[in-house]
Structures are given as C-alpha cells and as structure tokens.
Amino acid sequence: MTHLLDSSAVIAYYFDEPGADQVAFLLEDNRNPPAVSCITEIEFWSRLRSLGDESSFESNWKEIAEIVSIEPLTTNAATRAREIRHACQERLPTVDALIAATASVRDITLVHRDPHFQCIPARFLKQLYIGQ
C-alpha cells in the first residue's frame, strides 16, 4: 500500500467531483490498492446524511470497503496526530490530524482535497493534493 485516501478523496470519487479521476486511477491498481482510515466511515456517513441520503450508506460503504484497505486508528497515530497539530501553524481539525497521522506512521502518501492539510510539514507527511 502506497496511498491513503482522505475522506475528501473518497467523497470526490463517490460524487464524481474534481479529483475523482486521480482517485479512480489509484483504485484501478489491483496489486496495490489504496487504504482509508476507519474514521472515513463516519465522515462518509455524515456527508450522505447531510444530503438526506443516509439510507444508501450501508450499500455504498460496503462497495468502497471492498476495494480499499481500512486502516485502524492506533496509539502511534494518535501520538503522531498530536505532533502534527503542534507543528502546524494553521488550524487543523483533530479528525484530519488523525487521518494524516495514520498515513504518516504507515509512511504512505495522503491523497486529499483539503487545503488545510498543506500546513503539515513535509517531514511528517507525503501528500498528493487533488483539489483545484
């Protein structure tokens, strides 16, 4: 595994938003599929719920979970998230720090559309920004 998809990348793919093509390219690599954080499950559900589409969550999440590896939240990631938040000079939500830290401790590239991840120093995280 070389990439971890942030929730923003999963949502871009699911809703065919800008950056979806880059996520699709990563998902096509059957030998080395990307991962997602277990936190992405609740963020994806929250997005569907906010759009009034909560009922489709189970089937859609199952479909996503079949093509990615789901990474658990570990104590090492929690510690790294604290280090990352301390190093950021700008606001970085805790949930995003935990997702970034999961990629960081696994030494894989975080794929995202959230500009606020760019406050994370390169010594902590490899990033692929798929936003506009």
Describe each PLM feature range.
Residues 100, 104-132:
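Acidic, PIN/NYN-like endoribonuclease modules and their adjacent C-terminal/linker elements
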Residues 3, 31-35, 66-71, 109-111:
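Short loop->beta-strand "edge-of-pocket" segments that line small-molecule binding or catalytic clefts
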